[in-house]
From Swiss-Prot:
This is ATP synthase subunit b. F-type ATPases have 2 components, F(1) - the catalytic core - and F(0) - the membrane proton channel. F(1) has five subunits: alpha(3), beta(3), gamma(1), delta(1), epsilon(1). F(0) has three main subunits: a(1), b(2) and c(10-14). The alpha and beta chains form an alternating ring which encloses part of the gamma chain. F(1) is attached to F(0) by a central stalk formed by the gamma and epsilon chains, while a peripheral stalk is formed by the delta and b chains. The gene is atpF. The chain crosses the membrane at residues 2-22. It is a single-pass membrane protein. Keywords: ATP synthesis, Cell inner membrane, Cell membrane, CF(0), Hydrogen ion transport, Ion transport, Membrane, Transmembrane, Transmembrane helix, Transport. It is found in: Cell inner membrane. Signal peptide: none annotated.
Length: 171
């Protein structure tokens, strides 16, 4: 089949030379052409199977390599998707941690503000109580010193009932 196509192709190429009217009787172009076609046919006969098997094996190698590359690409894409999913989860976890930390910081701040307020109120109450005690103590000492001075002085005389009445009215 292939040889027939070659012969027809060769004849089509030589047809313009035949139409020109040149005298090619003195040349051996036809014999050489037939020898060439025979050589190509014999070469094709012996090498066709090897050439086909070589091309087929190369085609199989290429398709096998293509399948391997596609499998690697698929694995890479799956790995990328997995990593992107893990990244999203990590971002969500980080946002959750930050929000929890902010809530906890607010709670701790409120707790310490309340504790500080209570401590200040207690300090104020304690200082007022201490001031009241000191005032009472100073009044008592003053009254005692005045009564002591009055008793020691002979100008005024008090009995116990008068002292009790004065103390009740002043304290």
């Amino acid at each position: 089949m292939f040889v027939v196509k070659m012969v027809l192709g060769f004849l089509i190429l030589l047809s313009p030379l035949c139409a020109t009217g040149l005298d090619i009787s003195q040349t051996d172009i036809i014999e050489r052409s037939l020898n060439f076609l025979l050589f190509v046919g014999i070469l094709w006969y012996f090498l066709a199977k090897r050439l086909r098997s070589f091309l087929h094996s190369k085609s199989l190698e290429i398709s096998k390599r293509l399948e391997e590359i596609q499998a690697q690409l698929k694995v890479s894409k799956e790995h990328k998707k997995k990593l992107l999913k893990e990244l999203e989860q990590a971002k969500e976890k980080a946002e959750l941690i930050i929000s929890d930390a902010n809530k906890e910081a607010y709670t701790i701040t409120q707790k310490y503000e309340l504790q500080t307020k209570m401590d200040v109120e207690n300090l104020i109450k304690n200082s007022k109580a201490l001031m009241d005690l000191e005032v009472k103590k100073i009044k008592r000492e003053l009254v005692e010193s005045v009564f002591k001075d009055l008793r020691e002085s002979k100008k005024v005389s008090f009995n116990a009932q008068d002292c009790v009445n004065i103390l009740k009215q002043r304290l």
